[in-house]
Amino acid sequence: MSHSGDELNELEARQDPRLLRALDAVAPGTPLREGIDNIVHARSGGLILIADVEDVSFLFSGGIKLDIDYSPALLYQVAKMDGAIVLSADASKIAWANVQLMPDPTILSMETGTRHRTAERVSKQTKSIVIAISQRRDV
């Protein structure tokens, strides 16, 4: 099936740059995906915010400022703490760990889990990439 130039231009115009950036960041083979996969395999869950820290710090309550170079192993280690992990906008640094994110509670969310509801609200409020990784249980 071939597309005309106009159809391709229309498809490109409808693409959400934020979604494309998120997909690019978590694509298989990327360091971020490796770190996420480690958390998934450990079944521990996590909440990762990728943003310019200065733009989202108003949401922080507590936490530990790290400002260290990103590695999949370090992401996995800090995910063992209960709070959110904040990565720099380009995901090259682990800026903060064990952060409680406090988004606007009036932002509508259909999510039922606390982690996923927080992720949705933070993303809507800040237009940042937020990744919620479910904790797995053998039930």
Question: What are the roles of these predicted feature ranges?
Answer:
Residues 2-139:
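Divalent-cation
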